[in-house]
């Protein structure tokens, strides 16, 4: 595929769907950007400018067309202490350093590490985010009049029923119809309900380039680096997970390492325009895909429309009832949750269910995506090690003379299976020679090598001649490097201890 064809496919292959979905996303981004600014303890314009800049930049630099990136709650939570103790300028500097670290991660190809995240962890991550998205709407549904419940229910009805309207149901995104209808209804009837303008003051000027006013000293670096590192890790985790989810929704693939670099460039740009750090947003990405967005154009439209709406149409945007946006986000929550993971609980292995539920529990309890993913990956690794450790078989046969025994090892020898490997040998049997056939085995780590050393040395101590044969190239390399059973000096030193 040449450059012109690639540009056509990534930008202009779905123009109508991208324009409409981008507008829906822009409207949904506004209250969230304001809310995340409040969480971080900064002016609402910081979150709005960040969402504009990140969405526009990532449209050009990202590795996952159709995925929406902007200011997020997960990132905002990490900024609270920095803003409180040092102020906005240090936040902008930390945002830029976060971008540098993410670009470095892209060049180091850390995005490829996503292949080590199991499907059960991704499912747990998705379900946890769906729960968090729903929980985030509860304050808008608590201690309110019945009008809010009625409008939210009406909004959900529009979202789910409008697609069945002949001719136009599949042309216009139902979330956009929901927002427009409920806004018009609230303005005509004059309902006293919370609107976007109640979330905070919308900016009336375009963002301008500025350099953070912080001293360029080692002390400043020591202050911002821990926050920048945390932001970079959480941002990349959420972005990589979201990219995987959008891959599944669209049956396409993405360039994870390019996405790392793109997120970094976007965050540097955000910091230079007075915005906070951000990353991919699973909720908005799902809205975009469900509304028909597929290419980079949808993300660009979302960012540009966001800025135009808040700067030039703030009076109209401010009248959007929060109930309409709550309805949209509830739809996102329902659509994001993997209901198959609940229906198939009895069919899936217990280990898979434990990993999924643990990931959900940790993310929901801590509101920290990184903790949940870390726990999920560690549990998945432990279960895998335990499972693969059982796939080790050692058989033996004795020659007719009774003076020689051959042990045939089949499977993986590593820290989890090393005890089973050692326990498979009879060290007290009176034989002249023992052959250990490793042609169908693989040694993975120094624990496995130490187990082989232990077996060979104990057999030789009992007076048997030991021959190790059949090691594959990779196993032979690690055994030659770390093994001591064929190194007399090392064996003597080991025995002395």
Regions found by a protein language model. Name each.
Residues 335-485:
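The feature marks cytosolic C-terminal regulatory regions of anion transporters and related permeases
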Residues 1-383, 387-392:
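Transmembrane helical cores of multi-pass ion-transport proteins
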């Amino acid at each position: 595929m040449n450059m012109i064809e690639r540009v056509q496919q990534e930008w202009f292959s779905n123009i109508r769907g991208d324009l409409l979905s981008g507008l829906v996303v822009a409207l949904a981004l506004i209250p969230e950007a304001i809310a995340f600014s409040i969480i971080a303890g900064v002016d609402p314009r910081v979150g709005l400018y960040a969402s504009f800049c990140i969405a526009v930049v990532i449209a050009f630099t990202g590795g996952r067309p159709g995925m929406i990136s902007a200011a997020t709650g997960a990132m905002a939570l990490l900024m609270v202490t920095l803003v409180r103790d040092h102020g906005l300028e240090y936040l902008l500097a930390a945002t830029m350093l976060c971008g540098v670290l993410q670009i470095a991660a892209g060049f180091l190809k850390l995005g490829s590490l996503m292949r080590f995240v199991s499907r059960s962890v991704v499912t747990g991550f998705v379900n946890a985010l769906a729960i968090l998205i729903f929980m985030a709407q509860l304050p808008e549904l608590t201690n309110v009049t019945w009008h809010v419940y009625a409008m939210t229910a009406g909004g959900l009805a529009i979202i789910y029923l409008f697609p069945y309207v002949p001719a136009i149901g599949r042309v216009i995104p139902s979330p956009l119809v929901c927002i427009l209808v409920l806004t018009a209804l609230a303005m005509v009837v004059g309902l006293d309900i919370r609107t976007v303008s109640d979330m905070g003051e919308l900016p009336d000027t375009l963002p301008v380039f500025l350099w953070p006013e912080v001293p360029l000293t080692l002390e400043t670096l020591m202050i911002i680096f821990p926050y920048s590192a945390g932001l970079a890790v959480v941002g990349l985790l959420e972005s990589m997970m979201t990219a995987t989810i959008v891959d599944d929704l669209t049956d396409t693939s993405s360039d994870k390492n390019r996405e790392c670099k793109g997120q970094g460039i976007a965050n540097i740009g955000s910091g230079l325009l007075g915005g906070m750090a951000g990353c991919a947003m699973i909720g908005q990405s799902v809205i975009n895909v469900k509304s028909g967005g597929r290419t980079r154009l949808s993300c660009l439209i979302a960012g540009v429309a966001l800025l135009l709406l808040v700067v030039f149409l703030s009076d109209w945007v401010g009248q959007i009832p929060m109930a309409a946006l709550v309805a949209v986000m509830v739809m996102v929550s329902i659509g994001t949750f993997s209901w198959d993971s609940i229906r198939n609980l009895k069919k899936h292995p217990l280990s898979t269910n434990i990993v999924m539920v643990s990931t959900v529990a940790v993310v929901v309890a801590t509101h920290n995506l990184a903790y949940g993913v870390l726990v999920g990956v560690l549990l998945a690794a432990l279960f895998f090690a335990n499972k693969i450790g059982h796939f080790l078989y050692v058989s033996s046969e004795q020659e007719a003379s009774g003076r020689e025994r051959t042990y045939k090892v089949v499977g993986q020898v590593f820290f989890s299976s090393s005890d089973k490997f050692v326990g498979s040998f009879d060290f007290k049997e009176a034989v002249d020679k023992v052959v250990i056939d490793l042609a169908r085995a693989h040694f993975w780590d120094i624990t496995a090598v130490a187990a082989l050393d232990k077996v060979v040395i104990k057999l030789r101590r009992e007076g048997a001649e030991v021959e190790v044969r059949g090691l594959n190239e990779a196993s032979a390399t690690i055994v030659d490097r770390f093994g001591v059973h064929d190194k007399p000096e090392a064996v003597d030193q080991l025995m002395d201890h």
